[in-house]
């Protein structure tokens, strides 16, 4: 980075984060309601990868002459349930793998309404074998460098999304 920002300037940049939500993202009012409640800026935009990313609007005072999009550097892929990710790992595996191959280096898979324990105990409504499910989750993590965050209570998904991008940006600017 060319610039060294003061703490005050960093706060200004961080508070200007605008979350980008892919236009194909389904049922996510629990997330947008959180953003609205916390006055977090967001907008819908077609994303090439993932369901969420972010941008920083232009800020001439801080040397940012045009909007900065992080859509090719940092994304979140959200799955609403173990049933949804199970489908991605079985019937839609080829498509899912192609997406992950093309996705940015920094990404995370957010699985809502579930825990690792749910997979281990078979607490999901598909025929996907527990051992295969666990093997696929771990294989994808290492093969595609995609950490997995389980979010048993999806009420915290909005917080996770906002904080993930904030800390990516803080580390990016350091």
Language-model region placement:
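Non-catalytic C-terminal interaction segments of nucleic acid-processing enzymes
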Residues: 1-71, 83-174
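Conserved catalytic cores of phosphodiester-cleaving nucleases, focusing on short active-site segments
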Residues: 74-80
């Amino acid at each position: 980075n060319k610039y060294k920002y003061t703490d005050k300037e960093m706060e200004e940049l961080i508070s200007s984060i605008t979350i980008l939500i892919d236009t194909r993202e389904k049922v996510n009012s629990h997330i947008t309601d959180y953003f609205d409640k916390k006055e977090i800026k967001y907008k819908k935009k077609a994303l090439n990868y993932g369901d969420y990313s972010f941008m920083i609007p232009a800020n001439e005072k801080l040397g940012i002459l045009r909007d900065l999009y992080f859509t090719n550097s940092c994304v979140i892929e959200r799955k609403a349930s173990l049933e949804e990710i199970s489908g991605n790992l079985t019937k839609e595996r080829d498509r899912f793998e192609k997406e992950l191959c093309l996705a940015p280096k920094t990404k995370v898979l957010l699985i809502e309404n579930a825990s690792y324990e749910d997979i281990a105990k078979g607490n999901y409504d598909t025929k996907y074998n527990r051992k295969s499910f666990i093997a696929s989750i771990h294989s994808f993590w290492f093969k595609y460098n995609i950490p997995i965050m389980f979010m048993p209570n999806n009420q915290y998904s909005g917080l996770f999304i906002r904080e993930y991008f904030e800390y990516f940006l803080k580390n990016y600017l350091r």
